[in-house]
Curated annotation (Swiss-Prot):
Residues 1-20, 100-148, 232-333 are cytoplasmic. It comes from Mus musculus (Mouse). GO terms for biological process: blood vessel development; cell communication. Keywords: Cell junction, Cell membrane, Gap junction, Membrane, Transmembrane, Transmembrane helix. Residues 292-333 are annotated as: Disordered. Disulfide bonds: none annotated. This is Gap junction alpha-4 protein.
Amino acid sequence: MGDWGFLEKLLDQVQEHSTVVGKIWLTVLFIFRILILGLAGESVWGDEQSDFECNTAQPGCTNVCYDQAFPISHIRYWVLQFLFVSTPTLIYLGHVIYLSRREERLRQKEGELRALPSKDLHVERALAAIEHQMAKISVAEDGRLRIRGALMGTYVVSVLCKSVLEAGFLYGQWRLYGWTMEPVFVCQRAPCPHIVDCYVSRPTEKTIFIIFMLVVGVISLVLNLLELVHLLCRCVSREIKARRDHDARPAQGSASDPYPEQVFFYLPMGEGPSSPPCPTYNGLSSTEQNWANLTTEERLTSSRPPPFVNTAPQGGRKSPSRPNSSASKKQYV
């Protein structure tokens, strides 16, 4: 086993930008895979080739049978599995680091532009472009990047790749070795002169270790699938919330209108069928009554004697004359 310190540090940084299920997956990867394999793997599989014995004295037959029984060592196969399964996570970590550095550069550039004493149109456009780019990088209050936008796409792709690689390595282990370690391996391969029986050391202990690593691999695969479901539900809930907020904005705007719309009731101007007619005097309408009053007044005026008229009025003023009949008609009509 090599030094896993560098890989552990990288995956520890990924844990800060992962979901709850992703953190559990990292815990399973560290404790139940890397540490146990590093501590117990060498002691269990260290004598794999040295204690592989065959009942023949033919030179080279034991090595050929060992190559047929174990095309690749279990330890090396699991190491390759860890490296391949961890690679998508490392790619996601690279995306996180890239976005973090980009966000820092944008903030630094924004500070330099805002510090300028005079701001022309080009500076305002540059600030607007920087704000638009920073809006795509969602940063939490504690400084961590939120899994949204392009980062969400990278995270989903990494989880999918981990699931496919995990399932592929589990299938490959089953095709190469099976799920148990047989104590006797029958070999018939040149340069062996005949069918040779070869014996494996501590087969029961190795079988237990194989089953343990198999269970851990299945748990890791299930966690990856659960994380995909978690991400899908998270995206759907966020989309539903965004639609609700979008639908609620017009209602809130109408409620805060300082001049709300009022409802007025309009009564018909015409007379309804149940409204009583206007009262009349002596069966006459108002216009006919006015004409009758005017005619009566003219008759009374013609029957009176004419008033005394001064030929030379004092002060040069004329006495006001009575309005003529046309003016009276206009008055009463």
